Every structure is written in C-alpha cells, then in structure tokens.
C-alpha cells in the first residue's frame, strides 16, 4: 500500500513545494503547511488563530503549543483522514516529539520522512537567480527560466516595467543566513527521524520530473 502520511524535509530552494504539488495532484492528498494554516486561522478568527496573531503582531515566534494545536485541528478534518503531506513542521526535535504526541491522540502515524537533498552551491544558485515581475509577481530565473530579452516579460499583461527585480529574500546575504538557520535547526531533526528509521532521502539536484519519479518509487 502506498505511503499516505508523509513529511518532506529540505533546505530553502530544494523543491519541496514542487514535489508536494505533484504528490497532491497524483494522490489527492492535502498539503498541510504551517504557513497556510496560520494565515487561515488568523483570517477565520479562530481562538488559536487570534492567539497566534497576538504573537505575530509583536514580531514574536508563535509558541509550539499554539502551532501544534492548529496542526491537530487541520489533521482532524475529513479531507486529511486518508493521508496528508506535512510541510514546514516540525523544525526542531521538540516539535517532532509534540507531533508524535498529537498523532498518537488522533490514532494516526507518520509513515515516511523524505529529505530532498541538494548541494548548498546549487541551492544558492537556485535562490539568488530568481527574478520577479513587480506587477504580476511572475518568477523567472536567470539560468533555468530566463525572461525575454526585453519587456513585456509576462504574457498576461503588456505594461511590464523595464526591469525585473530580485526579492530581498533572494539576495546572497539573506539566502546564506536562511541556509545557516536550516542547517542548525534541521540536522538534529534528521537524526531524530533516522533513529525512528523513518528517514529516506532523494537526490534533489536533478530535474523535478526525475526527482518525483524516484520519490514515487520510494513511497510505493
């Protein structure tokens, strides 16, 4: 039987979002993203959403207990009963232990943790090479998906500005910091799931189609 409850790990730029979308399309599983859950709860004005907003408004980290509560609410919904793809949580071993507890409470289990492994030099090239249209937010890449030589850059409007922009998050300085944070927080998490014998990895330094083919083979 195919794996139906899984987690994707990987550094920024590894392609987790792309692979999650492909899995969603083929398997019909919901992607459970902490960012999406937080935004939805705040918008809906749920008790946990309001509590999370109180921290976010101060620029503080939302406590683990609040995030775990939001994830538990999401995993308890009917569309997640047949499986899910967890993205963005946990980020630390403490959060992983909390996840184990809530899954036990829901009588569910995490069946597989897949690490999409990409060399750091390739991650930096992927992230720093992105360029965005400031009007429609379409994303190009100076190497992998170069824009037209001259405007209009986008097919859905003809009033593109003369230059695309690099988002602040995609500068070399910020990308390097994001990768440092990822290494510090995720390496203990990788060991945590290795000890549970749930971790497997795929080489993410290939085309999305090739990575997905190996991912599906691993999941059965």
From Swiss-Prot:
Consists of three domains, a large central CORE domain and two small peripheral domains, NMPbind and LID, which undergo movements during catalysis. The LID domain closes over the site of phosphoryl transfer upon ATP binding. Assembling and dissambling the active center during each catalytic cycle provides an effective means to prevent ATP hydrolysis. Some bacteria have evolved a zinc-coordinating structure that stabilizes the LID domain. The keyword Metal-binding applies. Residues 129-170 are annotated as: LID. It is found in: Cytoplasm. One of its GO terms (biological process) is AMP salvage. AMP binds at residues 34, 39, 60-62, 88-91, 95, 167, 178. It is an enzyme of class 2 (transferase). GO terms for cellular component: cytoplasm; cytosol. GO terms for molecular function: adenylate kinase activity; ATP binding; metal ion binding; nucleoside diphosphate kinase activity. This is Adenylate kinase. Pfam families: ADK, ADK_lid. InterPro entries: Adenyl_kin_sub (IPR006259), Adenylat/UMP-CMP_kin (IPR000850), Adenylat_kinase_CS (IPR033690), Adenylate_kinase_lid-dom (IPR007862), P-loop_NTPase (IPR027417). Belongs to the adenylate kinase family. ATP binds at residues 13-18, 130, 139-140, 206. The keyword Kinase applies. It catalyses: AMP + ATP = 2 ADP. It comes from the Bacteria. Disulfide bonds: none annotated.
């Amino acid at each position: 039987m195919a794996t139906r409850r899984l987690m994707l790990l990987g550094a920024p730029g590894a392609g987790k979002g792309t692979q999650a979308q492909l899995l969603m399309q083929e398997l019909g599983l919901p992607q459970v993203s902490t960012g999406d859950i937080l935004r939805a709860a705040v918008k809906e004005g749920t008790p946990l959403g309001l509590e999370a907003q109180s921290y976010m408004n101060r620029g503080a980290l939302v406590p683990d207990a609040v995030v775990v509560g939001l994830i538990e609410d999401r995993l308890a919904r009917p569309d997640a009963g047949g499986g899910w793809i967890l993205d963005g949580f946990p980020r630390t071993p403490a959060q992983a232990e909390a996840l184990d507890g809530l899954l036990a409470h829901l009588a569910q289990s995490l069946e597989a943790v897949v690490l999409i492994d990409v060399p750091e030099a390739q991650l930096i090239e992927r992230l720093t090479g992105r360029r965005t249209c400031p009007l429609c937010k379409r994303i190009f890449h100076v190497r992998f998906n170069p824009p037209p030589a001259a405007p209009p850059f986008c097919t859905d409007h003809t009033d593109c500005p003369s230059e695309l922009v690099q988002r602040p998050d995609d500068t070399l300085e910020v990308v390097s910091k994001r990768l440092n944070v990822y290494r510090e927080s995720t390496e203990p998490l990788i060991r945590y799931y290795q000890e549970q014998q749930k971790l497997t990895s795929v080489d993410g330094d290939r085309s999305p189609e090739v990575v997905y083919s190996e991912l599906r083979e691993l999941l059965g």
